[in-house]
Amino acid sequence: GFLEYAENIGDYLPVRTEKLFFHQFAGAEVIKTRLYDDFHNADADRHIVYLKAANAFVVVDTVHPRAAQEMTTGVMYHAEHISPVEPGVYRVQEETAEGLMHFHRYKSASRAHAQQSLCIAFAGEGVSYSMEAQRRNYRQETALSCYTSRYYGADEYYSYVSLLIPETGETKQEIEAQRARALGIVHSLRTAHTRMGRSLTVQLKADGLEYTIGIQCDDGACIEDKNLRPTYSYEVGRASYGAFETDAKFLVSDGRTYGMIDGSRVDHRGKTLFSAYPNRCNQLDFVTVLQRAGTWGSYEDVL
């Protein structure tokens, strides 16, 4: 399994991490972090998107090797008890009082509600799953992994998509209803990516809303090299995410509203919803003038 492979690497390797942005929209929140692994000559980005109305989390982990190489990569979740539901779908049971006793200053309290849980689903094809026992945090836990071993081309991006849905309630009947709802959302989950994985689309349906998440995995996708000086271009950076087309680094929509981060234009079904004010850019020869547009840090509106 993936845990055994990771343990065979040896000691923890030094890495650097960085928070790139955190933004709150009316219907969603998103945070992006990056891990720099100089030992493996690769980087990894993580987007955590919280869909407020759906009360669900979409976690996207993108691996980007800096050179062509073979790698085994994956994502791993830890919990006291994890059980399989169907291929690629798992249920994390609520922590028990005995399992939490090792935490500092924890005091056992009587339960006033039924046993709650968390649904974890993985999207994508060609991946493997493993569940392995692990001694962690002074107790016995289960490590749930979604991983793959493959050859990465130069400038290739590979994304793992996880969907996390809390299954909560005060009674057993309420929790069972939430579990049925969670499976309905899981079965609507769809992903798509462009060549070399440079952009990723995640779509799902929840409570009558159709969500679209678009991620530009390649930070340099919008840079156009005109030999004299690199310039920003919407035409070079644009990508399609379902019914949307934009050059934004991130886009999220629930079918009624939309929000984007670091983009100059957003189109929906061929109609321009947002466009930054155009400007002109001189080349270093002071003769050639390029028509360009600056990006906005963020923007949101109704469709």
What label would you give each PLM region?
Residues 1-98, 154-158, 168:
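Catalytic and substrate-binding regions of extracellular carbohydrate-active enzymes
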Residues 13, 44, 131-133, 171-175:
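Short conserved micro-motifs at the rims of enzyme active sites and ligand-binding pockets
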Residues 86-146, 223:
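Trp/Gly-enriched beta-strand surface patches
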Residues 139-159:
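A surface-exposed beta-strand-loop module
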Residues 156, 165-303:
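Non-catalytic terminal regions with compositionally biased, polar/charged low complexity
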